[in-house]
Amino acid sequence: VSATASGGRSTGYAQVTATNEGGGTSVLDVTDPTGDDNGPGTYQYPTDSSFVAGSFDLTRFQVLSDGTFAYLRVTLRTLVPTFGALDGAQLLDVYVHVPGATATSTAAAFATRNYAISSSGAWSQRLEVQGFAAPVWVNAGGNTVGTPFVLPVQSDRTITIALPEAQFGTPGSGWGFSVVLTGQDGFSSDQARAFTATPGAFTFGVCASGGTAPICSVNPSTVPKAMDVITPPGVSQATELDPTLGAVVIQPVTVP
């Protein structure tokens, strides 16, 4: 157990962490382009120096299984302590589609995240990880499934979530994962950092100052809170996350 202190614009809590990164058999291994940590192509980082370039840039997503635990692992372009916690900048959600699950949802963690999950990725389990609140592991009804173990590793730029397969199940063919990364803000009702038309010290910008793209005129409170997602083949992140093209729906990556 490691204690995480309060600091900056963040809150603290006692965090249970795994003792190693885990491993086992690779179930799914997907890479994501470097430098697409701009949502639909226009999003900007907050201007405060606490927010380091690459902190919201997913570059890889892995699912592994050792028969006892399943491991969900993201790799980031940058993982550095922010507000006193190694994963203090990030808010990571993974929506898990399990074939045959009877109770599922396509809703985001909060309606104010401003996106939904595709019906093909309708989830029966959701994980949410951040540096300043206990990890969340719930089913589609909002009930706690179990206790996830979380390990951020700066040298590898990874955040690993270890889940007992007795509760999670053994991931395999047909399982889907909708992976969404945005910024954490413990002062926000949905735990996600807010957007403003252009970036503020502690808010993401929908566009840079002087931006002329159609999204630049959209109400910032209605844009999807997603700096980067893991997209399946043939899906453009810039298109998927653009609210001017219709409702924003996140597509899963699926185990063959």
Segment roles from a protein language model:
Residues 153-169:
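Localized edge beta-strand/strand-to-loop motifs within extracellular or lumenal beta-rich domains
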Residues 16-20:
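Interdomain boundary/hinge segments at the C-termini of tandem beta-sandwich modules
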Residues 3-5:
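Conserved structural position at the C-terminal beta-strand
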Residues 59-62, 146-152:
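Beta-strand-rich interaction surfaces with strong enrichment in secreted/lumenal proteins
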Residues 136-147:
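Short beta-strand and strand-turn-strand segments in soluble, beta-rich domains
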Residues 9-15:
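Extracellular and select intracellular beta-sandwich modules with Ser/Thr-enriched
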